[in-house]
Amino acid sequence: MASPQPPFGGGSNSNSNTASPSNNLSPTASPLLEGRDSPNLPLTMTASTVLMTLPRDATAALAEAGKFGQEKVVIRFKPVGSAPALRREQVKVSSTERFDTVMTYIRKTLKCRESDSVFLYVNSVFAPALDEVVGNLWRCFKDSTNQLNVSYSMTPSFG
């Protein structure tokens, strides 16, 4: 009759690094190693619930988030350096237009050639991307008079 072995492999013939198939104390397989089809995989909070439709409150909030407070916003142009001044220093632009519309307007008004450079800066601080929406820029960077200040220059002016 075989003598019972201690639970942690204290026998003379046992190797402490390998588990025998008859040992019931071996750990269960890790859920990460079982495969993707295993139903025992833990789910994150975002993956545990699938929403087929959004609740009415969320749908209304998302619809309102894309709208702008004003249909048109006022942009005030300020020349920097040797850039010529514009006749109309303020213009109204649709809040849904992209910033490249503003660039096109400035280039046309200043009668720039294709090879001429024009640099635009919001609040004399940064140059926004041309695909940025004017309404978003106005919402984030308007001044106390509800105008978006755009400086323009023929040479790079601000960092």
Curated annotation (Swiss-Prot):
Keywords: Autophagy, Cytoplasm, Isopeptide bond, Membrane, Protein transport, Transport, Ubl conjugation pathway. The keyword Ion transport does not apply. Residues 13-27 have a biased composition (Low complexity). GO terms for cellular component: Atg12-Atg5-Atg16 complex; autophagosome membrane; phagophore assembly site membrane. Pfam families: APG12. There is a cross-link at G159 (Glycyl lysine isopeptide (Gly-Lys) (interchain with K-218 in ATG5)). Belongs to the ATG12 family. Ubiquitin-like protein involved in cytoplasm to vacuole transport (Cvt), autophagy vesicles formation, mitophagy, and nucleophagy. Conjugation with ATG5 through a ubiquitin-like conjugating system involving also ATG7 as an E1-like activating enzyme and ATG10 as an E2-like conjugating enzyme, is essential for its function. The ATG12-ATG5 conjugate acts as an E3-like enzyme which is required for lipidation of ATG8 and ATG8 association to the vesicle membranes. ATG12-ATG5 rearranges the ATG3 catalytic center and enhances its E2 activity. This is Ubiquitin-like protein ATG12.
